[in-house]
Amino acid sequence: MKLKKLVWLTAFALSAGAMAQSAPLTIPHPTTFDQLNHPVAEVQMPESYVKAIAQQAYIWGYPMVNQFNRRATITQAPEPALNGGMVPVAPMGQLSMLTDYIKPAETFVTCPNQDVVYGLGFFELDKEPVVIQVPDFGDRFWVYAVYDARTDQIANLGKPYGSKPGFYLLVGPNWQGETPKGIEGVIRSSTEMANVIPRVQMDDTKEDRLAVQAPVREVMTYPLSQFDGKMKSYDYANIPSIGEKPNPSAGETKWVIPNKFFDQLDNVLNKVSPLPGEEALYAHFRHLVNAGKQDPKVRQWMDEAAEQTDKTVIADFFKWKNNGVPAGNGWNRSKNNAEFGVDYFNRTGTSKSNMFDNKPNETQYFYTDNDATGVQLDGKHDYTVTFPKGQLPPVKGFWSLTLYNSKHLFSPNELNRYSLGTKNKDLKFNPDGSLTLYVSHKSPGKEKINNWLPAPEGTISLYIRAYWGEQAILDGSWVPPKIEKVK
């Protein structure tokens, strides 16, 4: 009897063992994001966790919320116009152009430049493709920077690429229509949100101001339904001024409002698809946003984290040492600009400090708040910036040195001068072939006035742009000159 019982128990054990081994010994490894478990909606997240994820979301989403808010504002214009008499605005699908350098009182974007004639237009490509019209610019440097919602450029369109005059079609990620006859090429955006900023070189002379007007009139965008294969033009010299003039002392228009951020991030998560590898971030951020909708206390913690992050992490990006990488002599240089990918540090830093950069091969940026000894630049001191002979920025296009006030904007001065460079045909070189530029609040004297950048009182920063740089610009082997305090 005992033997039979033992046999039965052994058989049962073996049977149970066989059943246990019917499942794979190794659990299959997930190979796609959909095979992973996602955050659980019902969990009760503590304040510390909510704020940690909220801070990450604020840093990550800042550039895209910035973009969508700019689009919402700019496209309220009923026709191409100048907001406050100085910033191009236009209805959705169209652009507006300046006909001269941007006015110094503008606050739409930090670090404006007075090297080019700007334009601006925003698009909603899930509604209809847009035709981008390119006139014949001759030998003049030009580039149309076309950005997606992430502020990455999505087109190679300009003089550096040998782009032809004509018509280009900008389409959304899901567009499957037919390309009309007469279109030079198709630009596919990665997001429905896109914008274009044409930049057209103009020398600081009466003659070139006149010469640039003809091509500028033909810089246009319009819905595909209006395309007829004929070059159109627009009289930008006589467009109306709408809206109130900005207050430069207040700094750049605040495009990201912390206590509205998470409402707007919800739209971003729905409108902008994840980049490869971003799926987990989207899952975490959606989980957070949904929790904030369900629980007012969670939303309060999210808003508190947004406010704090804006005052600390985001504010720190306004210091040039926290942008890009060291370039020598106290300068930093931009890195991955306008092709950020998952470089969130530089993407968010640029969005805060100098939105809408060009790609490095189009423009390389060098910037600093400090002199050669590491001391903060201040308008109460006089400085010299000397380029040794043969060491001007090596470019195929042109270069400039621009001065900004503490808000990364222009401050009015007696010469109405905010930058010096290739555009200035009256710069005076030293007998040894070097070029010295003077940065000071007071004039350095009549003989040096052509090389003078007037500085406001208070802290300042300097900014070099190298358009269409040579290899030494691209690989970082060219080093910006020292900024030396005059004793």
Language model segments and positions:
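Gram-negative bacterial Sec-dependent N-terminal signal peptides
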Residues: 1-22
